[in-house]
A protein has these predicted regions:
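Polyanion-engaging groove/track-forming segments
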Residues: 1-176
Length: 176
């Protein structure tokens, strides 16, 4: 979850670099399966997809239509977040946009499904860490809202605040 959110914020602030887009794709919290993310990665490398090319239909190769469908599924929520952040007048508005992004991507449901899978495999410690990710993220966003809600914050600053907050989290091992 942390990789998806940080990757999405980096996409927005950094101009959709391939590495950031693929971080979102491979996070386990995008709408793509692992195989779809791998296929999209191979396509992007083969055809030099980077930056603004992620925001336009893919024209290359026999599999362009299939790959473009994956692109749309992956990029649409990030574009919606980008647009909401652009409209945000304050850091509080930006934090609310992140909450909506997490809702729109079903992040909590995906996290709970992962927790159930871990518990069914007898991995209670990992399941606990999994749940802690959500708690830490919500606490971080609540704190950002409380501290910065009326201040103007740009997208780059917000991405750094979120990434720093998640990096500094007190978990022995922060899962993706």
């Amino acid at each position: 979850l942390s990789r998806m959110l940080v990757g999405a914020l980096r996409c927005i602030s950094g101009g959709f670099l391939r590495a950031d887009v693929l971080q979102v794709a491979k996070s386990g919290f995008s709408s793509l399966t692992r195989d779809e993310a791998d296929s999209l990665e191979n396509y992007a490398i083969t055809h030099g997809i980077n930056r603004g090319k992620w925001l336009r239909p893919f024209p290359y190769g026999d599999d362009a239509a299939d790959m473009d469908e994956l692109r749309v599924r992956l990029i649409s929520p990030v574009e919606a977040l980008r647009d909401a952040l652009r409209r945000a007048k304050t850091a509080g508005d930006s934090v609310e946009a992140i909450f909506r992004f997490l809702e729109d991507t079903n992040a909590y449901d995906r996290l709970m499904a992962r927790e159930e899978t871990l518990l069914s495999r007898g991995m209670a410690a990992e399941a606990t860490q999994n749940r802690q990710v959500w708690t830490i993220l919500m606490t971080l966003l609540d704190q950002l809202y409380a501290l910065l809600s009326t201040q103007k914050a740009n997208q780059r600053d917000l991405a750094q605040f979120v990434e720093s907050g998640l990096t500094g989290a007190s978990l022995s091992s922060l899962p993706p």
